[in-house]
C-alpha cells in the first residue's frame, strides 16, 4: 500500500476541476521528491467509458496497458511523470462486476452479498493495490457529494481512515464559492451545506479548496473555516484561470503542498516548479500563430478531443506558437463543402467510430492533399486519407471501409479477420475483447522505415504508441496503393504478418497518417515529436502562402 492517501471529493456542482486539481497537487508533491500516483473512482455503472458517447462523457483515454479510462487520467499523465494503468481507474460497474464474478465462483462462501461489506471491501482493495510502491496516492472521487451513486465510494474512504489510521489519510473537499455580480460578493452558504452533507456520511474534510471567479478573501476563508470546522490555514482558494498549467504554481504559492507535508510529517525539499514557469512563459509569449482545423463529429464538446487539443498546445509551446484550434463538424463539410476549410494552415482528422460524417472527412483529406495543406490523420483520420487516395489517385473508385459498407467492392479498410484468416495471428496481435467486438488496445511496437519522414521525426527505428481501433488497412490492396505514390513508413509485425501503422505521401510538404494515437503520449513539458513537426509544417505553410 501507499504510505499516505489523499482523497479528493467535490461539492455543490460537478465539473469543478477535481482531476486537474488532483493532478496539479500531485505534480507539486512530485517536485518535492515524493513518489506520487493518482486514481479515479467513477460512480457510473458502465464497466468503463469505452462505449459511452464522447458527447456525454468526453474522450476515452487509453493507458499503455490498454485500459479505456476517463479523460482525467490524461490530465494525470500530463501533470506527473508516473504512467497510469488499468489499476488507476475503476467504476461502479467494474467493482460490481468483480464482486458478482467472485460470488459466482463461490469466493464468499455462501454469504449474502451486500454493498457493505462486499462492495466497500472491493473498493478498498483496489485503492490499496493502486498505491503499492508509492509515497502518496491521490484518489479523485467522481461526481458530487450527495449523489446516491457515490455513497459506496465515500463509505469506503471513510472506513480507510479507521483501518489505516487518520495520520495517513487526508480528505480534501473541492467546492464552489459562487460570485454574485449584482451584489459583488461571494457566497459561502453552498460550501457550508456541501460540507454538512459530507459530515452526514462520516467524513470531516481536512482541507477545503474553494473554486470561484474571484479570490476568496481572508474574511470569507475565516467564515468558511468556522462553519465547516476546519482550521483557517486549511482553507485555500483557486480562482478561474486562463491556463490549467498555472494551477501547480498557484497551489505552491498558497502553500497547499507544505500544509499536506506538515500534516503527514513529511520532510522534503521545497518544490522546484521552474519547468512549469517555463511552460507559462512560453504560453504567454508566443512568437507567432497558426490556424489548425480538427475535423470531427463530436465537436459540440471540446473534451471529446481533450488529449488532441492538449497535444497541439504542447507542440505550440515547443514551437513558440499560439495554436488557434477550429473544431469543424464533418457533417457541415458534407453540406457546405470546402468553404469550411478556408483560412486553415493545417488539417487534422482524429479517431472516431461509425459512418456519420465520414464523407465530410474524406472531402477534407482530398482538399488537404490537393492544396498541399499539412495533413495529420489519426486512427480513422489515417483510414479516410487512405480511402480518399485509393478512390481518387489509385483508381479504386468504390474504395471504402467494411465498417461503413459491409460488401464494398474495394474494402481497403477492414477487420483483420476479413482479409486474413489466421486464428493464431489474431491471438498474437495483442487484441483485447469487449462485449461488442475486438480491438487493438494499448502500447504496440511500430517499426519505422529508414529515410522516411516518420523516421526523421522520431529519430528512431522502433517506437511504442497507444492504439484503440478494430479496423486495419487491408494488406491485399497495399501494393497497388503504394504504386500510386502513397508510402507505408511504419509497420507492426506479428510472427510473419504485418499491419500498416503509418502512411505518408511524398508528393506533399507534410501528409502523415498514423493508426495509433500519439496524443496520449504528449505532455506540456515533453511534447510529442509528431505534433511538433506537424505544427512547424503548419507555420511553414502559413509563411509560404502569405
Curated annotation (Swiss-Prot):
Residues the record lists as binding Mg(2+): 72, 140
Activity regulation remarks: Allosterically activated by GTP, when glutamine is the substrate; GTP has no effect on the reaction when ammonia is the substrate. The allosteric effector GTP functions by stabilizing the protein conformation that binds the tetrahedral intermediate(s) formed during glutamine hydrolysis. Inhibited by the product CTP, via allosteric rather than competitive inhibition.
Top EC class of this enzyme: ligase
Binding site for ATP: 15-20, 72
Active site: 379 (nucleophile), 517, 519
Keywords: ATP-binding, Glutamine amidotransferase, Ligase, Magnesium, Metal-binding, Nucleotide-binding, Pyrimidine biosynthesis
Subunit and partners: Homotetramer.
Protein name: CTP synthase
Originating organism: Wigglesworthia glossinidia brevipalpis
The encoding gene: pyrG
Amino acid at each position: 500500500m501507499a504510505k499516505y492517501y489523499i482523497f479528493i471529493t467535490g461539492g455543490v456542482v460537478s465539473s469543478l476541476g477535481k482531476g486537474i486539481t488532483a493532478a496539479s497537487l500531485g505534480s507539486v508533491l512530485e517536485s518535492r521528491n515524493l513518489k506520487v500516483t493518482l486514481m479515479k473512482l467513477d460512480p457510473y455503472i458502465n464497466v468503463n467509458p469505452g462505449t459511452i458517447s464522447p458527447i456525454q462523457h468526453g474522450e476515452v483515454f487509453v493507458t499503455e496497458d490498454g485500459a479505456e479510462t476517463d479523460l482525467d487520467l490524461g490530465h494525470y499523465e500530463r501533470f506527473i511523470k508516473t504512467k497510469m494503468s488499468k489499476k488507476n481507474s475503476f467504476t461502479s460497474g467494474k467493482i460490481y462486476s468483480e464482486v458478482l464474478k467472485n460470488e459466482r465462483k463461490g469466493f464468499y462462501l455462501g454469504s449474502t452479498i451486500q454493498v457493505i461489506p462486499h462492495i466497500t471491501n472491493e473498493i478498498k482493495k483496489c485503492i490499496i493495490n493502486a498505491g503499492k510502491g508509492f509515497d502518496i496516492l491521490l484518489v479523485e472521487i467522481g461526481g458530487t457529494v450527495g449523489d446516491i451513486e457515490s455513497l459506496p465510494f465515500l463509505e469506503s474512504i471513510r472506513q480507510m481512515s479507521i483501518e489505516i489510521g487518520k495520520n495517513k489519510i487526508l480528505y480534501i473537499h473541492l467546492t464552489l464559492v459562487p460570485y454574485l455580480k449584482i451584489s459583488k460578493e461571494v457566497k459561502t452558504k453552498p460550501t457550508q451545506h456541501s460540507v454538512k452533507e459530507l459530515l452526514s456520511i462520516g467524513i470531516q474534510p481536512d482541507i477545503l479548496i474553494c473554486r470561484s471567479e474571484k479570490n476568496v478573501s481572508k474574511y470569507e476563508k475565516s467564515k468558511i473555516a468556522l462553519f465547516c470546522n476546519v482550521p483557517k490555514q486549511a482553507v485555500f482558494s483557486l480562482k478561474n484561470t486562463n491556463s490549467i498549467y498555472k494551477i501547480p504554481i498557484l497551489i505552491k504559492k498558497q502553500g497547499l503542498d507544505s500544509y499536506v507535508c506538515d500534516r503527514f510529517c513529511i520532510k522534503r525539499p521545497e518544490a522546484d516548479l521552474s519547468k512549469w514557469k517555463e511552460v507559462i512563459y512560453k504560453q504567454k509569449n508566443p512568437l507567432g500563430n497558426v490556424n489548425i482545423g480538427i475535423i470531427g463529429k463530436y465537436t459540440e464538446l471540446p473534451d471529446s478531443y481533450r488529449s488532441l487539443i492538449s497535444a497541439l498546445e504542447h507542440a505550440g509551446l515547443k514551437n513558440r506558437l499560439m495554436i488557434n484550434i477550429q473544431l469543424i463538424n464533418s457533417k457541415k463539410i458534407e453540406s457546405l463543402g470546402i468553404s469550411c476549410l478556408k483560412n486553415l494552415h493545417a488539417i487534422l482528422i482524429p479517431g472516431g467510430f461509425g459512418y456519420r460524417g465520414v464523407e465530410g472527412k474524406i472531402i477534407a483529406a482530398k482538399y488537404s492533399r490537393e492544396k498541399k495543406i499539412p495533413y495529420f490523420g489519426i486512427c480513422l483520420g489515417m483510414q479516410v486519407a487512405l480511402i480518399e487516395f485509393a478512390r481518387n489517385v489509385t483508381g479504386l473508385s468504390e474504395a471504402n471501409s467494411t465498417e461503413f459498407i459491409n460488401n464494398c467492392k474495394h474494402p481497403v479498410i477492414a477487420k483483420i479477420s476479413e482479409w486474413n484468416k489466421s486464428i493464431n495471428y489474431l491471438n498474437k496481435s495483442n487484441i483485447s475483447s469487449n462485449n461488442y467486438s475486438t480491438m487493438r488496445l494499448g502500447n504496440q511496437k511500430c517499426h519505422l522505415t529508414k529515410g522516411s519522414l516518420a523516421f526523421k521525426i522520431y529519430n528512431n527505428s522502433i517506437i511504442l504508441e497507444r492504439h484503440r481501433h478494430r479496423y486495419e488497412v487491408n494488406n491485399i490492396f497495399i501494393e497497388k496503393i503504394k504504386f500510386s505514390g502513397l508510402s507505408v513508413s511504419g509497420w507492426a509485425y506479428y510472427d510473419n504478418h504485418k499491419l500498416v501503422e503509418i502512411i505518408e505521401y511524398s508528393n506533399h510538404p507534410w501528409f502523415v497518417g498514423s493508426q495509433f494515437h500519439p496524443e496520449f503520449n504528449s505532455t506540456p513539458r515533453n511534447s510529442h515529436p509528431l505534433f511538433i513537426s506537424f505544427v512547424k509544417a503548419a507555420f511553414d505553410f502559413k509563411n509560404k502562402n502569405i
